[in-house]
Amino acid sequence: MADIDSRLDTTQATPIGVTTGPIRGSRKIHVASPTGSGIRVAMREILLEPSSGEPPVRVYDTSGPYTDPDATIDIAQGLPELRASWIRARGDVEEVAQREVRPEDNGQLGPDRSGGVPAFPNVRKKVLRAKPGANVSQMHYARRGIITPEMEYVATRENLGRERLAEYVRDGQDWGASIPDYVTPEFVRDEVARGRAIIPSNINHPESEPMAIGRNFLVKINANIGNSAVASDVAAEVDKMVWSIRWGADTVMDLSTGRNIHDTREWILRNSPVPIGTVPIYQALEKVGGIAEELTWEIFRDTLIEQAEQGVDYFTIHAGVRLPYVPLAAKRVTGIVSRGGSIMAKWCLAHHRESFLYDHFDEITEIMKAYDIAYSLGDGLRPGSIADANDEAQFAELYTLGELTRRAWAQDVQVMIEGPGHVPMHKIKENMDKQLEACGEAPFYTLGPLTTDIAPGYDHITSGIGAAMIGWYGTAMLCYVTPKEHLGLPDRDDVKVGVVTYKLAAHAADLAKGHPAAQVRDDALSKARFEFRWRDQFNLSLDPDTAEQYHDQTLPAEGAKTAHFCSMCGPKFCSMKISQEVREFAKLQNQDSAGFIAAEEAEKGMAEMSQVYEDTGRELYMGAGGREHD
């Protein structure tokens, strides 16, 4: 455990640390790009028992240096700047003085910072910005035919280092996607140029490991973290970020709304190997004391620049909540449930004006392309109950998001589209179809959707069902839901449950889409299960710790790890053990010609007796006199 300075959490007897070290049964590896460029991509290999004769299973890894035993983790220093040289080598950025941090950035902390958290010790004095007239977005490079190191990294990462993915099992229904057998850097470039994929990669977040979000790539997941006005602890937030990426979160959104927003975000960004997203309107609202009506374009613009200079990779912008759409939500069961959507709806009604986000959208886009920040166009009118699913308000906003997508693409800025929400199973595909139509195949990023409203405490399951379905239909990234959804802020355990549930949904979607090699891990686990390789079963699972814990609740002895049964059926009724015995028996019969002949004769005799049974009217034990014997 690498401890964060104890000053970050004065309420704890011992300082909170971040989890480090390899995931059980796995090792960190670095795979060289096949182009010979020197780019090395981090992955994870799950090691199997030597006696099995099976090779390691390679899996996508989001955990960054935290699972590398050779890495030195110092939270106060931050992570190595993987992309720094790539960014500067392009020659289109300049250094500028970072905007001065103000009290309102941290929730009106005074000059003495009382009630605040320590500032990150190594805050940059200079930050990067595009040179005047330049555009530093990955989409801009892609449309000029340039394959960036980020695109090359993504290609190697998506292939998991395999040279011939088509050799693996591929079976599924892709609903019109264009998933290749093998991902090349040119394929990545083309997908980004078309707007069908994004690589969130702010030039001021060089610590991030490039990843792609798009329907023709592996389905990704996002984890939300963040403090609130009633719960703020930067150490816990950094730990939740590290914990969530350990279990598979591809991106993390910092949704902080309380005090210390700026400083908390700095700690997270400097220690995050995955893209970080935010909802800037939350911080802007804090700057006006929580009064939505007092928001202005100038305050919002300043907040965007503040976060852009820190390195936020994508912004949720609720520019689709327009004044004419607000009355459409009035007849809903649950009205407007999006925080950002409700803030903008209130502002529109108070001023009886069009949203300043919509009016100034092109100016926002100018900021985005100067730092390579991707849009995550917010669904402020998403349904908050299945009764409101697929209604007029939801789809009116969706078509506006399509219009805004085209405006952003006109300036070569990357875009993904946020989606619902609460949608019953039979209405899910309509959401995907309309999004593809309205938004030109821009990546879809959905919260679930939750398929029923009756399970508070289990909404990671109600939403996991919808997430697997919509991921199969084409959603590129799934925003996790934890068991605490609708009930409270998730803690560390809730974050893990949410992430693992959504990794399951994303993987199920990859299988259903027929993604090359998606089934390799499933087949390896199935084989380990049939061969009673218990440790391999644990290690191949999404959550090895919980799998072994459940096994050990009834069979904790070390010998049980090699036993040919579990506590479900016991040694005499294990179906797989019996199947193995049947296999061995059949194998022996086939090897022994006399035994094979005897088996054939026995089968012939059984067929004859079966016919007698049919001929006698299916009566049992018929005697010579035609009477049934007792």
UniProtKB/Swiss-Prot annotation:
InterPro entries: ThiC, ThiC-associated_dom, ThiC/Bza_core_dom, ThiC/BzaA/B. Zn(2+) binds at residues 422, 486. GO terms for biological process: thiamine biosynthetic process; thiamine diphosphate biosynthetic process. Keywords: 4Fe-4S, Iron, Iron-sulfur, Lyase, Metal-binding, S-adenosyl-L-methionine, Thiamine biosynthesis, Zinc. Residues 1-22, 97-120 are annotated as: Disordered. Its EC number is 4.1.99.17. One of its GO terms (cellular component) is cytosol. One of its GO terms (molecular function) is 4 iron, 4 sulfur cluster binding. The keyword 4Fe-4S applies. Substrate binds at residues 224, 253, 282, 318, 338-340, 379-382, 418, 445. Pfam families: ThiC-associated, ThiC_Rad_SAM. Binds 1 [4Fe-4S] cluster per subunit. The cluster is coordinated with 3 cysteines and an exchangeable S-adenosyl-L-methionine. It comes from the Bacteria. [4Fe-4S] cluster binds at residues 566, 569, 574. Its cofactor is [4Fe-4S] cluster. It is an enzyme of class 4 (lyase). It catalyses: 5-amino-1-(5-phospho-beta-D-ribosyl)imidazole + S-adenosyl-L-methionine = 4-amino-2-methyl-5-(phosphooxymethyl)pyrimidine + CO + 5'-deoxyadenosine + formate + L-methionine + 3 H(+). The keyword 4Fe-4S applies. PANTHER family: PHOSPHOMETHYLPYRIMIDINE SYNTHASE, CHLOROPLASTIC, THIAMINE BIOSYNTHESIS PROTEIN THIC. Catalyzes the synthesis of the hydroxymethylpyrimidine phosphate (HMP-P) moiety of thiamine from aminoimidazole ribotide (AIR) in a radical S-adenosyl-L-methionine (SAM)-dependent reaction. Belongs to the ThiC family. Homodimer. This is Phosphomethylpyrimidine synthase. It comes from Sphingopyxis alaskensis (strain DSM 13593 / LMG 18877 / RB2256). The gene is thiC.
